[in-house]
Structure formats: structure tokens, C-alpha cells
Design a protein with these regions (language model features):
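Acidic/polar-rich alpha-helix caps and helix-coil junctions
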Residues: 1-191
């Protein structure tokens, strides 16, 4: 399905990419999206968000057990964005369209996954080791030795559960990578 909010965000992004500034119509659309979500006053004004966006801070990322992770929307073609307005538009899309299955298409369109060519991504789940949750299971249930009988990833790697690092023979054990060919989608000869 297609939502009006998605259409408005598409317009805002396209208009900004074309003109490199937000026109009055884009600002009014953005305010309408925020007001529909319950924001009022300055919180509904996109200029407030843009003015508060520090790209140096956004690009610091956050550190987890595997190192530093970033918002993939802060990158295009393997390069970090420097434009707080464009990043704010992308962040608005991420927030407003959450769980609607559009994020993947956005990341492909922005070529945001280029950064995985240099730095593989480790998928991490819940915080398992050194938490009360660890005590919920017996030693037989939490085998983390990397053998074929292992049930969880090793505590030596990170405190978080890594589903692809349970056994060392997993083809994604060293993380998910990316190649340019993966941006292409196959087209059927007949439909």
C-alpha cells in the first residue's frame, strides 16, 4: 500500500535533491507530517531539527561489542553525508515509515550499503553474557565453544548474541559484506 505520508516524504526528498534547499511547500508538508504524529510548536518545525543536527555527532555512531555502528542513512556511495538537511529528511523517513518495509528500498536508492564493502556488519541480538538472562539457562543450553554443537556465539567475541557467529563454518561468520552487483535486482524475461 502507499501512504500519503510516504508521498509527502518522497516529494520533500526529491524537491530538496533538485533545488538543494527546502521550498515553502516542502516545509508545509513536513510540518503536516509531524503535526499528524502529534508534534506541536517548535517540535513540528523541521528547521528546528535541521538546526540541531550536528553531522559530526551523527557520524560518530554508537559503540557496541563489535565496534562502532552507524545509521546507514548517513551515507551515500560509501561517503558520509555532510548536509544536515538531507540527513534530517532521511531520518524522518526512517522514523515515520518504520516497520513498513521501505527502509531497504531507501538504503538501495541512496547507495548506503557501500560502506559494507570495507567494514563487514555483524548482526547482533540481545544482551546475553554478563546479564541476569545468562543465569536462566544451564551450561548445557549455552554452549559457546564454536563447535558444531554450539548453541550461542562465544562470550569472547561480545556480550551480545550473534546468530551468525555460533559456528565458525557459517558463511556470514566474519560479517555481512556488500558488492556493487547486489544493488541490481533480477528482471524476469516474462511476467
Amino acid at each position: 500500500t502507499f501512504r500519503a505520508t510516504e508521498a509527502l516524504l518522497n516529494y520533500i526528498e526529491a524537491q530538496y535533491m533538485l533545488d538543494h534547499n527546502l521550498n515553502a511547500k516542502s516545509i508545509s508538508y513536513w510540518k503536516a507530517i509531524r503535526e499528524a504524529a502529534g508534534f506541536t510548536g517548535e517540535a513540528a518545525d523541521p528547521q528546528t531539527t535541521i538546526a540541531a543536527t550536528d553531522m559530526a555527532q551523527e557520524l560518530k555512531g554508537y559503540t557496541d561489542g563489535s565496534g562502532t555502528q552507524y545509521d546507514w542513512g548517513a551515507f551515500s556511495a560509501g561517503k558520509a553525508l555532510t548536509d544536515p538537511t538531507l540527513y534530517s529528511i532521511r531520518r524522518e523517513r526512517r522514523t515515520e515509515l518504520m516497520a513498513e518495509g521501505l527502509r531497504w528500498m531507501d538504503l538501495i536508492r541512496w547507495r548506503s550499503l557501500d560502506q559494507l564493502k570495507k567494514q563487514p556488519y555483524q548482526l547482533e541480538g540481545f544482551h546475553l553474557w554478563n546479564t541476569p538472562m545468562e543465569k536462566w539457562y544451564t551450561k548445557d543450553q549455552l554452549v559457546d565453544d564454536g563447535s558444531v554443537t554450539a548453541t550461542v556465539s562465544s562470550r569472547k567475541l561480545t556480550e551480545y548474541f550473534r546468530p551468525y557467529q555460533i559456528v565458525s563454518t557459517n558463511m556470514l561468520y566474519n560479517g555481512m559484506t556488500w558488492s556493487m552487483a547486489q544493488y541490481l535486482q533480477p528482471m524476469p524475461l516474462r511476467q
